[in-house]
Structure formats: C-alpha cells, structure tokens
A protein has these predicted regions:
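A short, structured active-site edge motif that brings together acidic residues
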Residues: 72-86, 106-115, 169
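Alpha-helical scaffolding within the catalytic cores
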Residues: 3-11, 59-65, 93-97, 148-151, ...
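N-terminal binding-site loop/beta-alpha segment at the start of enzyme catalytic domains
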Residues: 1-75, 196-198, 265
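Short, acidic/polar
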Residues: 29-42, 87-102, 149-152
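A structural motif
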Residues: 46, 104-107, 138, 162
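Beta/alpha (TIM)-barrel catalytic core signal, keyed to glycine-rich beta->alpha loops juxtaposed to Asp/Glu
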Residues: 114-284
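CE4/NodB-like, metal-dependent polysaccharide N-deacetylase domain
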Residues: 91-112, 131-135
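Acidic-and-aromatic substrate-binding clefts and catalytic sites of carbohydrate-active enzymes
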Residues: 29-32, 51-60, 84-89, 117-120, ...
Length: 284
C-alpha cells in the first residue's frame, strides 16, 4: 500500500484528502464552553475538529460551525461511532445524528471509537461504514484505540481500507511499533491526549519537557506537539482557553526543530503510562 505523504498543510490520507496537522479535541469540553472553544479555534486558523457521538456536545459544535460561515470544503471533521452501535441500523442512526447535530452533509473521517463488541459485530459495523462511504456520507473511515492484531483482523476483510488509527500518544507512551505498523499499512496515526491528561499528572509540567522548552524558548505544549508532528503524527490537543487554543496551532509548534539530544531525552521518558481509561478488548 502506498505511503502517506505530508506537507506543511497536513498529511494526505489514502483517499487524497489532506488532514491538517492539529485538530481541536472536543472530549470533555463542557456545554457552554465547547462552542466558544470551536469559535476560538476557527478564528485562530484551525480547520480540523475531532468529535465523537459519546462526547454529547456535537450540536453545540455544529452551532459554532454554522456561525463561522467557513465553507464546508475548508474543514476536516472527524467523529466516532460509540461502542453500543454495531448493527447496520444502529451505525446508520449514530452517523445520521452526528451529521444532523454538526450541521454537515458529510464527514471527512468516521472512526470506530473502540474495538469492542466481538469480531462479528465489528465486521458488520465496518461494512456499514463502507456503505456510508459509497453513499457519500463520509469521505474516509478508520479506527481508534486499535492494537496491531485488531488492525490485522480488520484488514483481512475490509473492502475500504482504514485511513486512520487514533490512539493515545505522548513521550511516556510513544507506541513506536504500533505507529510504524499502521504507517506500513498506509494508515495515518493521530494522537489524542498529546499532553497526557492535562497539566496535573500529565506531561506539561514534566522537568524534561520544561527543560527542552526553555532551551528553545517555546511553550511546553509546543515541545509535545512538535514531537508528535516530527513523527508524522497529527495531534488532537484539547483546550477551552482561547490563548492556549491559538498556541497549540501556532507557527511555534510547526516551526520547532527538536535536535538529537531533545529526541533522546524525550525517548527516555517512555514508561507505558496511559492517562485515558482504556476499554478492554472483548473476545473475538
């Protein structure tokens, strides 16, 4: 399968669409705040939004999208099918609700949120998503929180190949083998929780990250996002603070060049720590 290509604008999926490097994550963005966060993001240049049915805030995201008057073709919108939707009827209902709430006619990327429910159910879910591609409801489909064996199983029957695997990634959990495996399959990997899970107990206050930030005269967040982009991995930082939202998609992030010493120091942080609760994979 052909490798994905990248440019300053973003990384190109196997369907030819360009996914911008930085997305605004909308997980745990509270009602009344997520809309303002989307407005701030779009005003500061974001064109990539990461959403999900289970987040329960897509209607407010959609209101902000409509208010922005940004042409649909300039946006890249991702959402996800939750674990309780696996049959053809359920998947279609979940997708239709996201389309309605977001106020769009199609999705750029539709993901299975977690690989749970059993092999037969996941296969039916995927085949319905393939039909949604055929019908123009989504441009690309993919997965989230999948290990190598999950990906291999999907590839054994997929007619439309997965474009993306969205996983937790940061220096403490780089998942190098999984990232490289997905890339060999022609998939883009995207990073959720690139800072850990917020500043408290996450990565933003880590001494190594702070030292690298001081060395380059940049924010700690820029170090973590720059590390992700240097791996060819788009990142999905979440914030509801306008200044931080703008910082996360700034030229400082895209222009940061980590040197070999920086990369080695960050590699030394790997300890397998996860900051996001992970659903157990059910038996196939």
């Amino acid at each position: 399968m052909a490798a994905n290509t990248s440019s300053r604008a973003g990384v190109t999926l196997h369907n030819g669409a360009v996914m911008p490097w930085i997305a605004l994550g909308t997980w745990e963005a509270p009602p009344g705040q997520v809309g303002r966060a989307v407005e701030a993001a779009l005003a500061s240049g974001y064109r990539h939004l990461d959403c999900a049915h289970i987040y329960g805030n897509e209607r407010e995201v959609g209101e902000a999208l409509r208010a922005s008057r940004i042409p649909r073709e300039e946006l890249f919108i991702t959402t996800k099918i939750w674990n309780s939707f696996r049959t053809d009827q359920q998947v279609r209902r979940c997708c239709a609700k996201s389309l309605s709430d977001l106020g769009v006619d199609y999705l750029d990327l539709l993901l299975i949120h977690f690989p749970v429910g059993g092999r037969r159910a996941l296969k039916e879910c995927w085949q319905t998503m393939e039909a949604l591609v055929d019908e123009g409801k989504c441009k690309a489909i993919g997965i989230s929180n999948n290990y190598e064996d999950d990906v291999a199983d999907l590839l054994s029957y997929a007619r439309v190949k997965p474009a993306c695997n969205q996983i937790e990634l940061h220096p403490r959990l780089p998942q190098d083998a999984l990232v490289e495996y997905c890339k060999r399959q022609g998939m883009v990997v995207t990073a959720y929780s690139p800072f850990g899970r917020g500043a408290r107990g996450g990565m933003l206050d880590h001494a190594v990250v702070a030292a690298i930030a001081r060395k380059h005269g940049v924010a700690a967040s820029s170090v973590l996002l720059g590390w992700s982009l240097a791996r060819g991995v788009p990142a999905l930082p979440k914030s509801v603070t306008p200044a931080r939202i703008a910082q996360n998609n700034s030229d400082e992030v895209r222009g940061l060049a980590l040197d070999a010493d920086d990369v080695r120091a960050l590699a030394g942080l790997e300890d397998g720590a996860r900051f996001v609760a992970f659903f157990n994979h059910q038996s196939r």
